[in-house]
From Swiss-Prot:
Protein name: LOB domain-containing protein 21
Domain of life the protein comes from: Eukaryota
Signal peptide start and end residues: none
One Pfam family cited in the UniProt record for this chain: LOB
Record family assignment: Belongs to the LOB domain-containing protein family.
PANTHER family, alphabetized: LOB DOMAIN-CONTAINING PROTEIN 21, LOB DOMAIN-CONTAINING PROTEIN 4-RELATED
Start and end residues of each LOB domain: 10-111
Length: 165
């Protein structure tokens, strides 16, 4: 674990930035090496050295490295997006996930239309055995090429598999 490595003789990033002498009991030294000056500067700008020091003092030693990693990530994101921070990143990923789920439903609908499966029996959102068999059979890269003009039966026969009925 990084917090238990022997220290070099130079000051930690926190003491360098704060222009103070680094003591052997410095709470920042195990987690902000002298080479991590930019990381500590971001954490200091967002949270403040005093708050980080108090926080690290309250966290059990075995969890401090993860705490520092979390603070560094939050500070990085907060500086990029001061209003929303990590929540903005999460919301963006959730929006992207919904878009991809929609695209998947559209692709499944098109596949069902081309496969000859009765659309009233199978929903494009269901994981039907017929659809699962087709998706396992067709390479992912080829799914992107199916645009409605492709003869699906011929494609399946080219793979050596009969079309499912």
């Amino acid at each position: 674990m990084r917090g238990h490595e022997p220290r070099s003789s130079s000051s930690c990033a926190a003491c360098k930035l704060l222009k103070r002498r680094c003591t052997p009991t410095c709470i920042f030294a195990p987690y902000f090496r002298s080479s991590d000056l930019i990381t500590f500067a971001k954490v200091h700008k967002v949270f403040g050295a005093s708050n980080v020091s108090k926080l690290l003092g309250e966290v059990p030693e075995e969890q401090r490295q993860e705490t520092v990693n979390s603070l560094a990530y939050e500070a990085e994101v907060r500086l990029k997006d001061p209003v929303y921070g990590c929540i903005g990143a999460i919301a963006s990923l959730q929006k992207k996930m919904l878009e991809l789920q929609h695209d998947l439903a559209v692709a499944r609908t098109r596949l069902l239309a081309h496969s000859g499966v009765n659309n009233s029996q199978v929903s494009p959102l269901d994981d039907s055995p017929e659809l699962a068999a087709f998706l396992d059979l067709v390479p992912y890269s080829d799914l992107m090429l199916l645009d409605g003009s492709t003869n699906l039966d011929a494609y399946l026969y080219d793979l050596g598999q009969p079309p499912f009925v």
